[in-house]
């Protein structure tokens, strides 16, 4: 197989076979003759493969470089970039001078196996070594490069891979389509060209579009894998060495492998966080460097976010400030993360007027309605010079500020040097010391219900009693248990009983606003302190904001007069401005001192306006989403009574720097106290979900302790006509076997089959009368989020406005929120790459607990069931008869049988011991003991940042029709010249069809074969199967990819099924992929039609 030469001729953007017949003849038996060592599945289940050690680690990061994120310690992303202390370079036996086109990693230089990166001009090969990504794909992802060129001596010549229609060169969105009547392969981008309606009239079958990158490597017929002998002779770099080399190239592009030895002894890993600390200086010495690491990383990331050549639209905001609207391509590619309130600098460098620059704040980020960023410029003396008449030649820079990190460092310093910053008891508890609480006499309120809030249940009242009588309390609020109401009630009683102010904080502005609104209902005097940069951002509690209360305060006539003068004229004289600021500060102090409750973010608690104030009572909501130093900011303002509210079984803090996260900066103070056996008070009655939806999360994550405060009847929308498998149980897992693909950014994933079926489900809800605002679509991957948004807009049969109003976002964006109906798209569908983000139990817990009336999960159960947690979930759905497959109009119970997962899952119990109040369930295994808790990384992802450049601009490019005219040179080619080409019927006769007709799939409805399309072919993961005809996987891949090792992809399994007359046999010592032969055989038979021959 390795010696077989594959010859192609490159004609424009068509790839034409010169030796197809020889390929077909030589590759007929390759599937059964591959050595087990070459099988990618071999290492997954043990032996000498990369996963043979049996250990797993989840190492996601907020930059969403999920393509390099595996579940094993040998993967490229699971190893730190640094940590080179013990690295050794394994040089080849005979080191000699390598040609310029040698792989920059390993030195392999076979022309057919190397590819040139057009961004950095380095060459890389298709070898994988000990990782799961080929060297070229690994480099493209890590370096954020996307354009490549083949070697001049390769069979295709020095081809630059690009779309035949629009010319885009992003390899992550490029794929190929075989022509129906010509012996050519056409390269098209996934969107818009590969999905353009104008393509349907062409001689190309767009349902057969396949990506050029599969299994994290270029297709074998495009870039040949090196032989075993070449790999043995090559330089062997470990994944940490490759990661370090990529980092070196960012600073020194000409660095070589030899330069790695110079840094091999450097080990600058920070000291990990501890459970206990000797004193506050010890505490500061541990956390201080971690905060600095995160700060430096954030600064480097933000300062690299410069964007040139922008087109800007101008308009005046309601406050008469200039607003600039523009699209940032780097946001769409996932390289830039923006949030409302971030500061940006706009510059004009055109020729129509003198250079200009202005600074403003982000007031809008891309969402379903618009891909634009909106920046509101700050008022300045030269407002008239804003170039509103210009629209081109602008640039944008991110203005990085160290405010958040400086306040964390200052809080830790204050904790160390100021004895009055916290009480003695809190001081010792924060350091992890054993200390007895001093007995205090308090008079409990006669009734705990407060005006303006709902009645409390028994567990809420118990929590409030315990909080009021203890100086430090943790409240664990599982999903839907009313922790916001409980927190607001606690704040009311603390304010009334202690007759002192309460400081209320949370890590996000959204969480602060929600709690602030509830507290206001109780009648307490509340002030919402916001950052200066967010004063113009609309919120539900704007009327409570400090700056707004100052503006509305008319008791100070002088200040009122200056406010009106400034509003009318836009500016004040220097003397008036000085007096205005003085009077404003006085008014702010008065309002703050007279307030019962002050609400702000944790970082906002470090605002200088609060520096002179002392807060005896501090409550931090969503504290499990705050890094510990962030929580310290509000605590060092004199607290004597602290309440931390959160849920350590849901998502944790977002830490950008992997080394800092690995050292423990991603652990919240709440979690550390739990590990110190400080038992949280758990709220036990959930009011959100239908009881069938709360059963699994309760048993798996909360030891069966959750009780239902709502009945099944109260959470059943009988007015909604939806094909639930069990009408009284509004949940289902819809089996979809579509393959995952890499998104345009190269750092995320998408699944076209799942996206198409999400649209079908949303449309069905619309037709049943569900409002768009009541539907939420959750997906862990930004690539899928962007693709779903565009799929609904482009193919949805309902009103376009309705689809735009459906929120499509990441799990993180939905934490703390709820929708009537939730659709969860799992995306991951592969044989040996793992399931990435999905393996995080805390992320799954959040995703499963957002829906009130119904939950639909779309995923590939065959892949997901290999993970222990998902295995339990799938078995649960199957026991409830809610695991289904087939078209949405005719769902059938899945026949899938589950084997044992790779590792038995045990829910984390940490150090808390809660007695389960619900009935025991033998399906959910007993928790581990405290000493054997397994830790899971919970890296997070920022949502609402468009990723697929192509999908964002599909509206702009979609009108470009594909040329129907082939070059004249193709007139000599006929289908008979290539017997394996899918367009040729049996015996090479064009247009001939097999007997029988294709039936609808029961393996999840395909993209093409649905009630909303008129296409005659079905799709499994984008591989089209005509009525009785051969599939792309069974035809073209056999002809042009016979050298491909067995991967058990959809096409390979389909091919094996066809060739074995309907039997999915076990190949030469490989583990059989399908545990349930009947299910898969039935699925394939329905896709192909019974008359296939």
From Swiss-Prot:
Cross-referenced SMART domains, in alphabetical order? Answer: DEXDc
**Binding residues for Zn(2+) 1, per the UniProt record?**
103, 106, 125, 135
Instruction: Give me the ranges of the annotated region CC/SHH/C.
Output: 117-145
Q: What Gene3D superfamilies has UniProt attached to this entry? A: 2.40.30.230, 6.10.140.1240, P-loop containing nucleotide triphosphate hydrolases
Cysteine-cysteine disulfides: none
Quickly give the catalysed reaction: ATP + H2O = ADP + phosphate + H(+)
Task: Report the main location listed first in the record.
Answer: cytoplasm
Which one of the record's GO molecular function terms can you name? zinc ion binding
Name where it's found: Cytoplasm
List ligand-binding residues for Zn(2+) 2: 117, 120, 139, 145
User: Which segments constitute the Upf1 CH-rich domain?
Assistant: 95-252
Region Disordered: list its residue ranges.
42-79
Sorted alphabetically, the keyword list is: ATP-binding, Cytoplasm, Helicase, Hydrolase, Metal-binding, Nonsense-mediated mRNA decay, Nucleotide-binding, Zinc, Zinc-finger
**Is Zinc-finger there in the keyword field?**
yes
GO terms of biological process kind: nuclear-transcribed mRNA catabolic process, nonsense-mediated decay
Give the UniProt family note.
Belongs to the DNA2/NAM7 helicase family.
Q: What does this protein do?
A: RNA-dependent helicase required for nonsense-mediated decay (NMD) of aberrant mRNAs containing premature stop codons and modulates the expression level of normal mRNAs. Also capable of unwinding double-stranded DNA and translocating on single-stranded DNA.
The protein's name is Regulator of nonsense transcripts 1 homolog
The organism's lineage? Answer: Eukaryota, Fungi, Dikarya, Ascomycota, Pezizomycotina
């Amino acid at each position: 197989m390795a010696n077989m030469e594959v010859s192609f001729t490159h004609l424009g953007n068509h790839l034409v076979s010169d030796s197809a017949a020889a390929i077909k003849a030589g590759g007929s038996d390759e599937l059964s003759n591959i050595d087990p060592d070459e099988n990618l599945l071999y290492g997954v289940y043990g032996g000498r493969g990369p996963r043979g050690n049996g250990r797993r680690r989840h190492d996601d990061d907020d930059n969403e470089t999920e393509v390099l994120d595996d579940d094993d310690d040998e993967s490229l992303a699971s190893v730190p970039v640094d940590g080179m202390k013990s690295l050794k370079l394994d040089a080849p036996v005979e080191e000699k001078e390598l040609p310029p086109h040698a792989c920059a990693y390993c030195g392999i230089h076979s022309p057919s196996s190397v590819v040139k990166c057009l961004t950095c001009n380095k060459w890389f090969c298709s070898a994988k070594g000990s990782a799961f990504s080929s060297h070229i794909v690994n480099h493209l992802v890590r370096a954020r490069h996307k354009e490549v060129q083949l070697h001049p001596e390769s069979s295709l010549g020095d081809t630059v891979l690009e779309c035949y229609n629009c010319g885009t060169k992003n390899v992550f969105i490029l794929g190929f389509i075989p022509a129906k009547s010509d012996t050519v392969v056409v390269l098209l981008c996934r969107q818009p060209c590969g999905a353009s309606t104008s393509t349907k009239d062409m001689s190309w079958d767009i349902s057969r579009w396949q990506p050029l990158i599969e299994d994290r490597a270029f297709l074998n017929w495009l870039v040949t894998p090196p032989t075993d002998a070449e790999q043995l002779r090559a330089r062997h770099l470990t994944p940490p060495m490759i990661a370090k080399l990529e980092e070196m190239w960012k600073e020194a592009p000409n660095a070589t492998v030899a330069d790695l030895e110079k840094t091999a002894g450097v080990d600058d890993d920070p000291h990990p966080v501890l459970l206990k600390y000797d004193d506050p200086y010890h505490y500061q010495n541990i956390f201080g460097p971690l905060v600095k690491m995160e700060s430096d990383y954030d600064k480097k990331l933000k300062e690299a976010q410069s964007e040139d050549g922008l087109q800007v639209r101008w308009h005046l905001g309601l406050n008469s400030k200039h607003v600039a609207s523009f699209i940032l391509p780097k946001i769409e590619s996932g390289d830039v993360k923006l949030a409302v309130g971030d500061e940006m600098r706009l510059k004009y460098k055109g020729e129509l007027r003198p250079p200009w620059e202005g600074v403003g704040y982000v007031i809008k980020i891309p969402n379903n309605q618009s891909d634009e960023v909106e920046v509101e410029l700050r008022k300045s003396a030269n407002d008239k010079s804003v170039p509103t008449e210009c629209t081109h030649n602008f640039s944008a820079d991110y203005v990085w500020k160290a405010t958040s990190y400086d306040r964390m460092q200052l809080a830790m310093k204050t904790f160390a040097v100021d004895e009055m910053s916290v009480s003695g008891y809190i001081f010792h508890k924060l350091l992890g010391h054993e200390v007895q609480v001093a007995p205090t006499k308090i008079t409990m309120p006669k009734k705990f219900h407060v005006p303006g809030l709902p009645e409390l249940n028994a567990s809420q009242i118990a929590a409030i009693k315990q909080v009021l009588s203890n100086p430090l309390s943790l409240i664990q609020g599982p999903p839907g248990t009313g922790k916001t109401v409980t927190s607001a009630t606690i704040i009311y009683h603390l304010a009334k009983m202690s007759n002192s102010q309460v400081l209320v904080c949370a890590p996000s502005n959204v969480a602060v606003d929600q709690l602030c609104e509830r507290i206001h209902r109780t009648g307490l005097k509340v002030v919402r302190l916001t950052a200066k940069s967010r004063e113009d951002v609309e919120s539900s509690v704007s009327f409570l904001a400090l700056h707004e209360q100052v503006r509305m305060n008319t008791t100070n006539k002088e200040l009122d007069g200056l406010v009106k003068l400034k509003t009318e004229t836009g500016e004040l004289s220097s003397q008036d401005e000085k007096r205005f600021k003085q009077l404003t500060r006085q008014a702010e102090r008065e309002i703050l001192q007279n307030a019962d409750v002050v609400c702000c973010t944790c970082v906002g608690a470090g605002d200088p306006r609060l520096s002179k104030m002392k807060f005896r009572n501090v409550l931090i909501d969503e504290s499990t989403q705050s890094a510990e130093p962030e929580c310290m900011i509000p605590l060092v303002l004199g607290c004597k009574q602290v309440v931390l509210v959160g849920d350590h079984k849901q998502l944790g803090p977002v830490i950008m720097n992997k080394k800092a996260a690995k050292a423990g900066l991603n652990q919240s103070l709440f979690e550390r106290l739990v590990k110190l056996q400080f038992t949280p008070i758990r709220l036990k009655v959930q009011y959100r979900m239908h009881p069938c939806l709360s059963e699994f999360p309760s048993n798996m994550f909360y030891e069966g302790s959750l009780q239902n405060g709502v009945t099944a009847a109260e959470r059943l929308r009988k007015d909604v006509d939806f094909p639930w498998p069990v009408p009284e149980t509004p949940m289902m897992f819809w089996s979809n076997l579509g393959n995952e693909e890499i998104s345009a950014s190269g750092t995320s994933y998408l699944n076209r089959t799942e996206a198409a079926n999400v649209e079908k489900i949303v449309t069905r809800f619309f037709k049943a009368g569900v409002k768009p605002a009541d539907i939420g679509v959750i997906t862990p991957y930004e690539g899928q989020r962007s693709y779903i948004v565009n799929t609904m807009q482009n193919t949805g049969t309902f009103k376009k406005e309705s689809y735009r109003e459906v929120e499509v976002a990441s799990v993180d964006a939905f934490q703390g929120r709820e929708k009537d109906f939730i659709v969860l798209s799992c995306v991951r569908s592969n044989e040996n790459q793992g399931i990435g983000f999905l393996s995080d139990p805390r992320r799954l817990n959040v995703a499963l607990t957002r829906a009130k009336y119904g939950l639909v999960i779309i995923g590939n159960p065959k892949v997901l069931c290999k993970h222990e947690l998902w295995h339990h979930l799938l078995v649960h759905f199957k026991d409830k008869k809610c695991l289904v497959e087939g078209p949405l109009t005719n769902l059938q119970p899945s026949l899938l049988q589950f084997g044992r997962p790779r590792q038995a899952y045990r829910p984390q119990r940490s150090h808390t011991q809660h007695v389960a109040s619900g009935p025991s369930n033998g399906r959910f295994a007993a928790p581990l003991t405290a000493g054997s808790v397994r830790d899971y990384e919970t890296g997070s992802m920022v949502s609402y940042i468009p990723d697929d450049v192509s999908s964002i601009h599909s509206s702009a490019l979609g009108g470009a029709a594909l040329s129907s005219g082939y070059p004249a040179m193709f007139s000599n080619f006929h289908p008979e010249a290539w017997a394996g080409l899918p367009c040729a019927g049996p015996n090479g006769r064009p247009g001939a069809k097999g007997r029988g007709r294709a039936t609808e799939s029961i393996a999840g409805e395909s993209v093409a074969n649905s009630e909303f399309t008129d296409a005659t072919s079905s799709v499994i993961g984008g591989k089209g199967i005509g009525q009785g005809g051969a599939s792309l996987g069974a035809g073209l891949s056999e002809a042009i990819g016979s050298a491909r090792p067995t991967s058990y992809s959809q096409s390979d399994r389909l091919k094996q099924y066809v060739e074995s007359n309907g039997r999915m046999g076990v190949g030469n010592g490989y583990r059989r992929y399908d545990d349930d032969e009947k299910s898969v055989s039935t699925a394939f038979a329905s896709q192909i039609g019974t008359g296939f021959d």
